Each structure stands twice: as structure tokens, then as C-alpha cells.
């Protein structure tokens, strides 16, 4: 998507700019697609659909008591507050009758208000009269020469606001920010001053930028040729989070100017923007901390700025703090000065050119451990009592930094690299340039309580955020429609780097599992292309989903495999060198690949079939003699005819790889490109079987003819290790997904996993457990307990030998240790063998030692879950959660607490986390997902979400990853039409923006698919079991 450009002549000041009434190709018509932008975390305002004429200052929130009663009644009756008509609202006061024979006399206040309304109405009518005519339909205006496009908005002071687009104009661009902040961590307020050097690219009177929640006290303007500061008028349009600085003189193209804005604001109580919180240290003393989380749209809440990724600039940051605190920002500290009042002012060096969402600063009590790496000082920060848990992160960061510098052939450009573990942080981590922020659990590692999965998590997250220093920071997408360029590349490099320098962690197993789950999401009708047009805040937030991260990275894996690792690296290095410190779009990446391939392959044409279409292909293979007949169509889980894609609407350019019997993987991998609906591959000889999509490096599902499926099933029975563990897991995944679609009998899927008694690798076993667990959950939640029990018994018989071989230790390779965790959790969850007895003995001994006895870290979660089944065990775990300092151990305890079958305990857990009591609100989505995984918690989780929806969307932005997880985690196991209707009715009664959320549509579709799966497979499952 191209950034918004304004190449129109600027009208004289205080007049409406013509450009705001013309639609840009990438701008949504707000008469049809309004942006519902959250103004503050605790005050979300919505305007009625199609209305852009909100006039503030007219007492729009001042309802009479009768009107408030009507509002309450309307909500009780299920009426949508946003869709009520003004006629209904006025009728609430229509029942007030005057005494008989008397005429009511309007008060002076009423007459003044009426006169003001009349003036505003006349102004609006004049504006509309002077604009091009439009006949509005349900869909809005479509013809540019007949449409007003966007109706002129009003500023908060009632004046016309000179800009109506969500995107900022490009008539003025920032060059440098000088930001000074003085936070008060006791009152949770701050004072700020920002001086912005800008350049005018076109003649204009107005400078439009972002600002939300600021009490602006003074704005001055100065041109580069004059040293005289002049007062400037400021207008605010809070609906878009924008302010307009009306300059005292025209800004001339090519000239530089300086704005200075002085303001004050509250430190946010949510997790977005410049936010603060308190925590209790190991001495039970209350401590205060402030940090930032600006991505994607929250820098504007910390300081007025041009808050779009393409508006890159440099930053000089000063922070005034109390002496006991440490202040950090993106760049190294330049100086510290003690002020007259005893406060300290830290000034940081001027930054490199970067986007606003990457700006960061932290104030709190911290300690650090550091190491120099070729002139860059790498430091890991944590609160003082947890500094002993940063050693692994430092060692890992040093190795990864050296690897990325060598691979990208570009040195990390800053003199320091800080990684900070923040006690209360909602995101997993954030890649702020030079100041990476993390949850404690994703950065700290305690060898006594952190499992192999914990170690792998810390390593992956550090790798991901370091990769962002090049992909996202050095080279940045122009707009959020191409977020996948940031997140897809960082995710790909995360796994790629681990395979190179931490090969023992077998991170490919995690990447494979992530691809399986992402493809399940991408097979829904509610999916979206990874490069999608976005405008509103909700749409931007929704781009932060598994498709941007894992589909994006999966496509890069497929491309690397097809082109070769050397060609791929050469293209990536060229891309980074060509676009350093710039803003780019997808075509710039593909152009680099085309340059490296010398146009022998049109990479851009090939990859656009993957980035601009939602979904992925189903490749159907039939072997006849020495030929493979191939066809492609979209893999689509929903079988309803009315939403089936047409056969001609989807076509991908698919790199097809395959291996046959007796062929060595490294020498005999064959690759072809299918860029048509069907094709034929000639084999050198007749073979018994063929496995397409080697190691699942391609982003597609493969369906074989009946005989070919049977040949593969037979091969797994006689010798599964002819195929790689990735391919065995791939076959399990594909056949169960096809069975759900009805392409393969469910019996055949279970026939394929009959070989599992001979399987000893993690990926195939965990994928089989995942697929059968989905079926178990559907059966259990619908009350088919006998069938569910028989299913578990059958799976247990297949894996009985492997389960009995497991020891309750932390011995073995990382992959073996993770397999042990999965197998023992399966056995104890379903009370199979002597698993629960052994776990309970370990728990009792641990509890008797008051939690001081060491437990094997890889089975700790399973032990805690078994122990939490008793009231005494649950209460003991709760006490330990509150008192211990290891985040790794706390997470294991929390999962056990949330796995209880006691609904009172579960409700208390969710409520406590929502309120931030005992459990931080950052844990809430994890708690809801865990509660929703079990019976009867899945019903309770949904009830809790319904009851507290308004509070949830106040704490977390609408469309955010947290809201996505909460909606999915509380509904994904519903499989009845009653629940479908209930979920749909609930969200229909929320705001229109809420119902349109992709995660809501996905939740409804998943419930429909669960119903569809049961209707299609229940009978055959009953017969087979």
C-alpha cells in the first residue's frame, strides 16, 4: 500500500482543504467503514455509523435522570446503545407533561443552547450544500464524482478541523524530536515538552499530527530563518487522535520549521503507551515502575508526534527522575545532571532515524549484567532481586547478535543493546531499537525451576527481538498492511538462527507445530491475506495475529527451500543494504529477489499469489505408473455451499517437492513449480509410494489417491524411519485435517497412526496427541463420555510402551525431555497407568518440604496439576504462587490452579486477574484459555467473558492479540447450535466494530465447524471405537 500523499494545492488557512473530500485508493470511505478509535484505555467512545458530525462541548454526555433510566432499560432489553434512534431517546422526556392550561416557558439556558445548535446546524447545511452531491445508499457512495467521500469533522472547540482522513497528510514531515519528560511515579502523572523539527514538502497552513490524552498548555511555532517564537492555534479531533497546529504563517515547500508543544498527561494504567504500575519486592516493600509499549498506535499517547511508521525521524530524549531510579531509553546515556530540587535529568544521545513506535523509555529500580560485543555493550536488566536469573539471557544474546551481524553482513548500528525484564508487561516482548522489553518469563531463566520448554522459549523470544533490529527497525514497512515483513521475517530468523547455533534445541519441532496450527486458522473463511488493506485502529491491531507471524515465516521457509539457502541469503542482504533506514513495501523485497535470480524466476509474481490471497492450496496427487497427476484448489474447511470459493478464484504458484521409496533425502529431493490448476510430473521409474511436500517445507496440504494413502500407511507400519520425523508428523496432520473435511474416512486417519507404537520422535507423537485431543474435547463437552473414554484407551494402547519408559527426571536431549512432558501429561490427565499415583507422591513430598524439595522441571506442571485436584494442594499452590520469585515456577503453578474442576476457584482466579489482585492482569488471557480447555471450565470462561466484556475492552484494545486469545479461548470448544446462537447474539449486541472483529467471526466459524465435524464423523467414530 502506498502512503497517503497530498499533491493538491493548499487552500488559504482556515479553509477546508480540497484533499480531504477526495478518496485515496488506500483510504476507507468512512460513510461505509468508520474507524472506531479508542481514545483512552478506560474511555472508549464510538460514533454512530455514518455520522462524522460529533460536536463536542454541547453536553452530549449530560443525560437527564429519565434518559439515564431509559439507557439502563434499553441495555437490559438487549437494545444496542449505538443503534438507538434519536427519536427513541427523545421520547424518554416526552412523557413529562405541563400542568393543564399552562404553557411551558423555555429557560434562558435552553434558549442559548437552542441558538447554538441552530448556528451549528446552519453551518453544517452550508458545508454540505457547497459540496458535490451524493445519493447515499446502504453501501454508501461509490462514484467519486458524486461523493463527498468524507464529511468535514469538528474539533473539540466546535471549529472545523482541517483534516478528515485517518492517515496523516504528507505535506509536512518530521526530521527530529527533542522530548523532555518528568514522570511522577507516585501520582502517576507526567509533564512533557516536545520540540519537533519539520520540513514542509508542500505549501500549507496546517500541521496535522497525532496526540491523545494530553492537556496541551502551550504551542509555539518558529521558522528556520527566524529566531522568533510565535504562538500557534491548536485544534483537536480526538476521534482520530489528531491535532492540527494552525501556523501563524504559511509553510513553504522545502523550508524547515520548529514546533514546541508543552503538555501534561496521566501515566497510563493499561499496558499501552507510557504506563506505570506498582509491585511488591522480596522485602514486601511497594515499588513503582514505568515503561512504554508504543506499537502499533500508542506513541501518540506519550507525546505529540507523527505516529505512522513511514514518518521516520531522529530523537533526543531527556528524562527527569528521582535519584533512586534508573532511566533507560533507546540510545546510550549522554549525561546526568542533578537539578536544584535534587532530581536528576538524564539526557540520551540522538538516535538513529527510526519510527515512533520504536521509541522507548523506562524508569524504575533495576540492576544489570553486561558484556561488550565488538563495541556494542549488551546489558540485561531486571529488578534487583531477580538479577541472578539473567545469565542465560546474556550468553544467548551475545551469540545471537554475532550470528545476525555475520548473516546480514550489517553491523548492529548502536553502541548499546539493553534487554529489560519488566515485572508487568502485556506483550511477550517488544523490539524497541536498542531497548528491548520483555515479560519476565520470556527473558529470565532459573535453572532450578525453568524447564526445557522455558529455556527454548527464552531463546526464541530473544532471537525474534534481535532479528527485528534489522527487520522492522533498520528496514520498516511503510504501513501496517505489510506488518508481515516485520513479524514474518523476525519469526523466520528466530527459528533459522536457533537451528544454526542452538541445534540441540530442535526448534524445528516448534516451527512445524506452529505451521500446523496456523494453517488451521488460515483454512477458515474468516482468514485474511497477510498483506491486507487496513485503516482503523481495530484493523491494525488485528494484523498482529498468527498469520502475520507464522504464515509469513512459513512462506519465507518455502521460498528459501525452493531457491536454495545461498540465493535466499544473498537476496536478504541486498534488501537490507538497499533499504537501510527507509520504509518499504512487499514489492521492494521481491525486487531484491528478482535482482538476485536475474529474472530467471519471477519471484514477485510467484509470491504475490501467496501474500495477496487468503488461505492455501490443497494439492491432490494421484500416481499412475511413472506419472504423478497433480491438481490444486483452495483448502477450505467449511463445507457450506454458499461460502465455498469458486474453482477459478484461487491459484497459487506452488513449489512441489517429493521423495519416493529408497531415495536419500539429501540427494534425491525433486522440486517442480505448479503454476496452473493441474500438471503432470514424470518419475524416472515406477515406485510403491511417493511423499509430496518434503519436511513440510511448503505451505500446503496434500491429499493422495486411496491406493497411495494405503501405500504410505503400509510403509509407516513396516519401517516409519524411511521418512523423516517432519514428514511423519506432516502425514498425521494432513490426514486428520482431510478427515475433518470429509475427503478421507476417519478410520483411515486412525489406521495411519496405528504405527505409533514404533515411533520415538517428538513431532509425530505430539501431533497425534493434538489431533486426538481435539476429538476427545468435542466428545467430552457434548457428554459422550463413553466414546471419549474409548478414544483415550485406544491412544494409550498405541503409546503405552513409550509412556511406561518415561522417568520422572530431567535427563535426555531437549527433544526427549519435551516428549516426556507431553506423554506424562497425557497419561496423568486421563488417569492412565500409575501416572497420577507417581505424580501425587512427588507433590506430597514437595508440599511436605514447604516447596523446598527439588522437582524435575520438565514434569513440574504435571505434578502441580495432579496436586491441585485436592483442596489442600490447590491452596498450598496458591500460597506458593504469591510468595515465590521464579516466573517459570509461577507459570506452572498458575496453569495447575486454572485446571481445577472447582468452578468457584476458577471464577475467583479469573476475577482476581481481571482486577490485578494476586495475579497480574497480563496473565488473564492465559487463565481464560486454560480454564476454557477443560470441563466445566469452558462454560464458565464464556460466562466470565460475557459478564466482563466492557472491562476487558477497556484494559486491552479492541482487536488486540489479547482480545483475540480471550475470544478464541472461551469459545473454541463449543459445538452446539445453541452455543452458536448465544455467541452470535452476544456479539451482535455489542458495537458494530466488535461484531466485525475478525476474531469474533472466526469464533463463530469454529463453532460451526465443530458442529459440522460431529455431524459428519460421530456415526463412523462410534462404529470404529
Curated annotation (Swiss-Prot):
Reaction(s) the record says it catalyses? Release of an N-terminal amino acid, Cys-|-Xaa-, in which the half-cystine residue is involved in a disulfide loop, notably in oxytocin or vasopressin. Hydrolysis rates on a range of aminoacyl arylamides exceed that for the cystinyl derivative, however
**Site (Cleavage): residue numbering on this chain:** 154-155
Q: Where in the cell is it found?
A: Cell membrane
Highest taxon of the lineage: Eukaryota
GO biological process: one example: antigen processing and presentation of exogenous peptide antigen via MHC class I, TAP-independent
Annotated active site residues, numbered on this chain, are 465
Q: Which Gene3D superfamilies match?
A: 1.25.50.20, 2.60.40.1910, Neutral Protease Domain 2 (1.10.390.10), tricorn interacting facor f3 domain (2.60.40.1730)
List the cofactors.
Answer: Zn(2+)
Where are the stretches annotated Tankyrase binding?
96-101
| Modified residue annotations for Phosphoserine | 80, 91
**Which protein are we looking at?**
Leucyl-cystinyl aminopeptidase
**What taxonomic classification does the UniProt entry list for its organism?**
Eukaryota, Metazoa, Chordata, Craniata, Vertebrata
